[in-house]
Each structure stands twice: as C-alpha cells, then as structure tokens.
Amino acid sequence: MPKRLDINTILVIGSGPIVIGQAAEFDYSGTQACQSLREEGYKVILVNSNPATIMTDTATADKVYIEPLTLEFVSRIIRKERPDALLPTLGGQTGLNMAVELAKSGILEECGVEILGTKLSAIEQAEDRDLFRTLMQELNEPIPSSTIIHTLEEAHEFVKEIGYPVIVRPAFTMGGTGGGICNNEEELIEIVSGGLKHSPVTQCLLEKSIAGCKEIEYEVMRDSNDNAIVVCNMENIDPVGVHTGDSIVVAPSQTLSDREYQMLRNTSLRIIRALGIEGGCNVQLALDPHSFQYYVIEVNPRVSRSSALASKATGYPIAKLAAKIAVGLTLDEIINPVTQKTYACFEPALDYVVSKIPRWPFDKFESANRTLGTQMKATGEVMSIGRNLEQSLLKAIRSLELGVYHLELDHLKELDKETMKKRIIKADDERLFVVAEAIRQGVTKEEINEWCEMDFFFLQKVENIVNMEREVKANVGNMEVLQAAKEMGFSDHYIANAWNKTEREIYDMRKESNMTPVYKMVDTCAAEFESATPYYYSTYGDENESIVTDRKSVVVLGSGPIRIGQGVEFDYATVHSVWAIKEAGYEAIIVNNNPETVSTDFSISDKLYFEPLTIEDVMHIIDLEKPEGVIVQFGGQTAINLAAKLEAHGVKILGTSLEDLDRAEDRDKFEAALTKLGIPQPVGKTATTVEQAVAIADKIGYPVLVRPSYVLGGRAMEIVYRQEELLHYMKNAVKVHADHPVLIDRYMVGKEIEVDAISDGENVFIPGIMEHIERAGVHSGDSIGVYPPQSLSEKLKEQIIEHTIGLGKGLNIVGLLNIQFVVFKDEVYVIEVNPRASRTVPFLSKITGVPMANIATKVILGQNLVEQGYGTGYHPEEKEVYVKAPVFSFAKLRSVDTTLGPEMKSTGEVMGKDLTLEKALYKGLVASGINIPTHGSVIITVADKDKEEALEIAKRFHEIGYNLLATAGTAQSLTEQNIPVQVVNKIDSEDYNLLDIIRQGKAQFVINTLTKGKQPARDGFRIRRESVENGVACLTSLDTTRAILRVLESMTFSAHSMKEITQTKRHEVVHA
C-alpha cells in the first residue's frame, strides 16, 4: 500500500528530559522518525522540552517547539499549527500518555487530528492492565494469576487468596515507576501506596510472582497489510524479577531450543496482530526453565529502550521504519537501508553475540539502595559485540567506565560464602561479579543456579572466563595462551597485571607477533547479501572487513554510557563535530559504545566502530585507520581522560594540546596561569595529606569547598563548615596521596556565572553568558540557568568578557572552553575552566543560533574564526529569556538525599523560553515536572543559618495568600516578625506531624535547607524523601524558592485595602 496522500502535516511528540527509565534512546528514535517522515515529503512539527538533544535541532523537523509536554502547551501548538496527524509512539511513555490525555480532552477531535501508527485503542489495551489481561484471556495466552486494584484493601484481599510474593505493576508508567516485588505485608503497604500514586489512572496490577523464570523479549514490527516480522529476540541473563532495563541482556537469545524460540515468536506475532499495532512493539515473556510453560509479562506498544538496543544490535533501523509504516507504507515496499538491496520484510540474522550491561548511578549515590527489582535504577547502558559470549561480555564490562577491565572486583575477594549467597539471591548491580567470585572460590554452578536460577549456560560462560584466568596466570609469557585469552575478550590491562608487566608491554608483544584484532561488519543478514553499512566491531579472527580508504580521516571519541554528570549533551556535541568533519572534506570516524544515542547510528559518520573507550580498543582502530588525529573535546571526561595515553602512543591530539589541557586541570599550573594573566580566583591550595588539608583550611578560613582534581559532575565534592567535617571527608570520601591531590578553596557565597566560548588561539568568540539562579556551591548542572543574564551590570559583564578572552588566549585553547565564575562583593572570580565541550553547548547553540560544536571542530581542523565569519567578542544577546531547568530522578532512587550541593544529581534538563523571566521560569519549572499551584500551604523548616533569609520568603508567600506551616523553631522567628504561621509537630512526635501533612497531600511546597551533622540532618533527609515519594515539590535552595515566588507573584493578583496603598505611598515620600 503506497504512502498516504490525504495527510500533509504530522506532529511528533518527543519524550522530554532524560530520567531513569527514559534516556537517550528516544532522542535516537525521534530523530530517525522525523528524518524518515521528511524523506517521504511530509511536513513535520516536533514538540519536546529537552534542549540537549539532536531531535530538537531546528534542522531535524520543519518546525521545532521546545515547550513543556503538558496538555496546556501541546494543545496550544495543535490549535496554532493544525496538524493532520499525530505520531506519539516515538516519544516513550511520555509521548503515549500525552496522546491519551489529548484524546480524552477532546482537542484531537476538535482540530481533526488523527493518531498514526498505533491506534488509541491499542495503546489503551496494552497499557491499561485490566484491558490487557482481558485480551490475553481472549487469545488464550497464559498470564500470571493477577488482579487489578485501585485501593490498598483490594490488594490485601488478593494476597489472602494467593499468598506472597506478589509483583506490583502500576498502569501507564515506565521504567517500573512505583512498582516492586512484595514479600510481606510491610512491603505490600509501601509499594502499593506508592504505585497507586504514580499511576495517572490510580490503577495497579497485582500478580503472582513468577520470579526465577527466564525473561525473553521479542522486538516485532507489523504494517497495515498485516505483514509482521521479528526484528530481534533478546534474553536477560538475570531471570524474571529484575526490570529488563536493569538486566544484563544478550541478543540473540542463547538458551532457547528451536521449539521454544518458535513458540514464543508465534505468541509475539499473535499479540501484535491482536492489538492491531502498526509499527514497532516490544513483547516481554517469561519461560519456565523446566517445562514449555510460558507467560506473557507485558507489551510496550511503542518504540522503547529495547528497540534502540535491537536496532543497534541488528543494524535494522526500527524507528525509521516504524515512522514509514505509520504513514501507510508496508514492509515489502521499504528497502532495508542497511543492505540497500533487500526489503524490510526480511528478518535480520546475526552471526555474532551482543551484550548490553546497564550503567547505574551508585558511584554518585553511595547511600542508594543497590538492590535491583522491578523498578528501574540505571541511567544508561553500554553495548558490545563479539564473536562469542565471553568476548562480548568482557568488552561490555570495560565499556562501563567504572575503572574495571575484567569480570572481577577487588572488594569482593574478601567475601565469605554466606555473604556471596545473600548477594546472589537478592540481585544488585554487582551480581555477575559476585557469581564470578563464587566460581573462583569453588562454589559449584549447581549451587549458584539454586540461589538465583541463572541458566547453566551463562554460568558455564562465566566459568570459562575463570578457567582462562588460571591458564593466563599459569603460563606467563606464553603467546598461545595470550592468543586464546584475547579471543575470549581478555584485556591487555588484565593480562599485564597477571604477568606483572605494563599494559604497553603486552600491547607491544602482540604487535610484534601480529596478534591484532580484525573488524567485522554489522549487516543484518549474517553476510548473506553484500552490505553497504560502515558499522564495525572487533574480534580476533582471520578476515578484516573494514577497508581503509585513501581519504584523510579524523577520529572522534564519543562519551560512552549516559550517567549523571555526563548526559546526552555530549552526544549532541559529538554528532555535530562528526557533521563538521564531513563538511570540511575529511572522513569522519566515530568510536562509541552507547546503543541509545544518535552518534551510534551508522548513517551519521563515515565509519562507526562500536567499541569500548579504553586505550587498547581505541589504539587498535588508530593503528588500522592511521587518521590525521583524534578529537577528544566532545566526549566529556571519558575522552579527555584518554588524551595523555593516546599521546604517549604517538597519536596526534587535535585542538587544545595535552599540555594546555593539563594546565587547565592541574591546580598549581592553573593558579600560576591565572596569576600571570592577572585574573582573580578564590584563595585555594592543594593538599596531598590529611594534615596538610587541615592546615590549609585553618589558614583560608571555613567554609571551604573540597574536591579531588580531575573530575566531572562534581564527584565527591563538598562544602565543609568545620574541622571534624573536613576530617570525615578526607577519611571517607577520597583517598588522598601525591597522585590524587585534594583541592581546598575558600567557599564564596555569590552569584555563579557560566560562559561557553570558542577560541582559535588568536580570537575568542563568546556565544553567550548564563546566570545561575542558585548561588555558587550548587553544581552548575543542577542549577537553573538563565540566558541572557538578568542581574549583571554592564561593568561586570565587560569584566567577564575580558577574563574569558584572556583565558582563551592565555591557556592556548583551540576549540571549546567553558568557564565558571562567581561574583562576590561586585568582583568577578574564576572558579574553574573546562577546556572541552560542556553540558550547556546544546542549550546555547539552539538559543543563539551559533552552531558551537560545528565552529569549534572547524577551528580544530585549522579554519580560524575570522575565516568562518566570527571574530573576537560577545555575540549580541537575544531579546527573549531562556531558562534551563534541571530534572531529577529521585523517585526511582529510594534512600538518596535530594539536597542540592556541589555534587551533581540531575539526570536531565528542560528549557523554558518566553518574553519575560517569570514566564520562561514558569515553563521551565512546569516542563521539569514541578506543579505550580497559585494557592495552598507551604511547609518551612530551615537551618539556623538560613532563618533570617527565610523570613522574607515566608512574608512573600503569605502576601500571595499561601498558608504557612512550620515547626516550633522556625515558627517562632516568623511570629516575632508578625507573619501568621501554623505550628506543626516535628517528625519524631507521636501525634499528627509534618510527615503526615506531606503524605496526605496537604502541602504544595516544602522548603527545607540542610543542617550539617547532628540529628536534624536525618530529620531533614526524611522530610525531603517523603516529599519526593509523595510528589510534593521540595526546595532545598532558597534561591530556587525565590525563583518560584517570582513566578507565583506574576500569576497571582495581590489584594491590598485602600488604606495600605496610601500608607505605602506616604512611606515612599518620606524616604525619597
């Protein structure tokens, strides 16, 4: 069936900010879909609130709206643009829920907008747990015995009948939000109450736990002609009970017999047909390992995290084809873009093994509960490809960037059998490492299988790795053993440690005897047809399929998995850099390992190597390709950290030199450079011992800011108010020694300013200056940023511009630089300089129209700023106001403190733009998920140091009609100032207290600032967590609170009696 000609304009809904459960995979699928629809000649209108993505680039769609994804704003866009159709299945759960909300509000009918791809009825049938259960019963498809509940009482009834454990799955949520496994009544009450709150329709499915079955996923496609195919099937190494986003996944499935494979394949196709889905769909199934009994777990009637993985694992571009199917094309009419010969109705075949390992944020959140269950906790993932499972797994492990190069963790070596058993039974992020350790210590596969039901096949693979370790250690210097270990995916790093050599020595040994990897192509058809994709993975074998051309090439290093501190912003910069390299006439080669991102789409670069970002894996590619050089500026800290090792191998680093990179990162060299340039900075020193640290802090005076050098996202950074806190930090947070010094700075309570600039060594061009709403001390990634700055005098702005130009030239920067300043007592101080792309590059590029990563790449390749039409100085400011607001994923991470400080905690960002700061802030806050009611109650509990400042805030809340609630101490200071306040009991009171008010939804805002040390810190923690669990906006910074007040004041009308007005005027005359 040819494409539809009765529609012209299509609205695509994006997935909004990156949160746990919904990451960069939707930037990839959304970008693909927009391009795909435009190829077919449709006009595409995109709405998405996330400025950090390629998807929201003006070139991606005909019109791009970066607006909040709420009914109010999307309805406005529909009324203004009048699209013929809406495509919601590429924006994750956000896009689906938005479509349902739009349909229910009547706006689609009013404006005559049709939903494309998957019909509303199919979305509801798949997402509404009750309707889905009914459909499965009609199809005679087995599902675990279950019931639908809307109250806690109903949950208790079900459990009486069926017994524990039960699984709770809230309707219309993603990433398992609010769900979990309940083993007893206490867990049931907690999880069901939370689940009902998180579900937009207050509905949960309770089902008998089938934990322990194999978890299998099928990624299927169907068109309007009822052609349906399986793109890829995947198997979770972790049995049912761990969310698939938190599971280690392999593709294709490894332990299914042909009969089992065909049985589950037929079920998946039957379900997609029954739902009438046109496009991509993901079916999750559970298979009993001891019989042919299976259960249908759930269906995602949309492009998902698994489809991004399946696309990269097979090379078959699901989102691109789903968009074409949505406009009426059929699988037998669409050419597969990979082979460019076969049609899309051929099922892909794989002649390699793919492994996906999630990347969790526990290195940032020491206190988080690391146990894995049905609620997702990972922020991102890595993927790797190998010729055997062992190779594939070991490559994935070293892609995670946790400083781990092998399936072993030193701190697990001390574990006794009982502890290992506990950690294997109750899965956490290190379970596979614990399994390997258990096998090393002689625990049998049978015992481990009994503990966690992990399939013997996978346990055998882990045992193969452990046996090979013994071989390697027993045969030092033996080249045959080395060859065998390399074929199994062992790293030079591991072998060097085992053989007591350096990694470089092993690398040289291999090179001398020609023991180097070859590169194989990912072609969707297991080499059955010739293929046109330049998409490669390494393995040890005979024939190399990556043909080196005679064109000059440049290698760009990507940024690896998405994690807190290094998000999709760096992928954005990477992609733009690749495009600029192509424009400049070079061959662009990219190395990356994140299956979710646009940069790992094979159509972006001239060559894509899906490989770990370690020195060994990158050097193999460089040895083969012999590029002009490598660009490390766009891959975040991942790429920067490889610069020194690459240079030691004689590789040319393009852009800012290694020496100059080091000058910006090394504290003493940086101080010397600033002194020479005459640029002021907060007083600070470097300590290499604990005693030194104490002496420095005493001399500078508290509070001080302490942090390790060379760090991204503010890991292990703290503001310390007294000596015992400093000692606690030095002993627990960092291991200080000469190679890892700790920086100690005077902490200045001032306004923070952030600048991104491009330097070519002669000229320095500044696209924009941003002002942070939160004062210095809150990480820049967690602050609300405003452009253009609203409260900087011209004098200060000139100083900032002057210092930026001075630093660009003085540090010999070639390419991008990001500088953070603090304004303290009307003086500008430099806090830090990052000689690389920063997380504000996409935001500033979009609002100023200056393609920063593109210009910087061309500067790096030798075309100066003047030749590109830019000079030195500050780009003229835009008239509108733009706000970048952070988005957090605290609801997914129980027991993590939500307080903002120098350590970054946000997972994503949104943008709000409008003519005034208040309107832009309103949009930014609403887009980030903060509800802003114009009246209600606000709870105020603040640290003593903030009491005075909180008075003015309380007064303003009172004036716009808010009801104030406070605990005794804070209430007393308010009453003394004649501010009406209601006293509430502290949380340790037996009576109705502060937490009850939060739980019952009787407060709209909670203002709680941190009291350091002592008991109040724990109280504050409980107040903040309770707010998150109950969806109440909890403000831990008085600056953020002021910003929200500005918005509220602009939305509400004040009410003053006439007498008050005349008194005010008289008062002004007296003071004039």
Swiss-Prot record:
Positions annotated to bind Mn(2+) 4: 832, 834
Cofactors, names only: Mg(2+); Mn(2+)
Catalytic activity: hydrogencarbonate + L-glutamine + 2 ATP + H2O = carbamoyl phosphate + L-glutamate + 2 ADP + phosphate + 2 H(+)
Segments of this protein annotated with the region Carbamoyl phosphate synthetic domain: 547-929
Binding site for Mg(2+) 2: 298, 300
CDD domains: MGS_CPS_II (cd01424)
Binding residue positions for Mn(2+) 1: 284, 298
Annotated binding of Mn(2+) 2, by residue: 298, 300
Note on domains (UniProt): The large subunit is composed of 2 ATP-grasp domains that are involved in binding the 2 ATP molecules needed for carbamoyl phosphate synthesis. The N-terminal ATP-grasp domain (referred to as the carboxyphosphate synthetic component) catalyzes the ATP-dependent phosphorylation of hydrogencarbonate to carboxyphosphate and the subsequent nucleophilic attack by ammonia to form a carbamate intermediate.
Assigned protein family: Belongs to the CarB family.
UniProt name for this protein: Carbamoyl phosphate synthase large chain
Species the sequence originates in: Bacillus mycoides (strain KBAB4)
Source lineage: Bacteria, Bacillati, Bacillota, Bacilli, Bacillales
